[in-house]
């Protein structure tokens, strides 16, 4: 009897853990933790992207991929460099829409 109760309790804990992880995954989350860096060397940036607020994250995130080791870094969206990157991406997207 004791083994049966233990097995049921263990199964319930495993199910609850899996269900909780699934719900967190569906909700999404921010990619950047903390305020982010003020600036990085422009020559070391391979790619930049801006992620606007959504249901999963309520803040603007500026993420740059570095040439060395393909590491990603988060920039503070209020920093001068991040604002310049966001303007450049918006201009590029605007021009792309104009050419369609």
Swiss-Prot record:
Subcellular locations according to the entry: Secreted
Gene Ontology terms: biological process: adenylate cyclase-activating G protein-coupled receptor signaling pathway; chemotaxis; immune response; inflammatory response; positive regulation of release of sequestered calcium ion into cytosol; regulation of cell population proliferation
Disulfide bond positions: 30-57, 32-74
GO cellular component terms attached to this protein's record: extracellular space
One GO MF term attached to the UniProt entry: chemokine activity
Keyword field contains Endoplasmic reticulum: no
Protein family: Belongs to the intercrine alpha (chemokine CxC) family.
Function: Chemotactic for interleukin-activated T-cells but not unstimulated T-cells, neutrophils or monocytes. Induces calcium release in activated T-cells. Binds to CXCR3. May play an important role in CNS diseases which involve T-cell recruitment. May play a role in skin immune responses.
The name this protein goes by in its record: C-X-C motif chemokine 11
């Amino acid at each position: 009897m004791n083994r049966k109760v233990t097995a049921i309790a263990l199964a319930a804990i495993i199910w609850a853990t899996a269900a909780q992880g699934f719900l967190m995954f569906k909700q999404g989350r921010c990619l950047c933790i903390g305020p982010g860096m003020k600036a990085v060397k422009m020559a070391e940036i391979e790619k930049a992207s801006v992620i606007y607020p959504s249901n999963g994250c309520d803040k603007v995130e500026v993420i740059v991929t570095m040439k060395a080791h393909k590491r990603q870094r988060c920039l503070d969206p209020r920093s001068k460099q991040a604002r310049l990157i966001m303007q450049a991406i918006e201009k590029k997207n605007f021009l792309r829409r104009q050419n369609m």
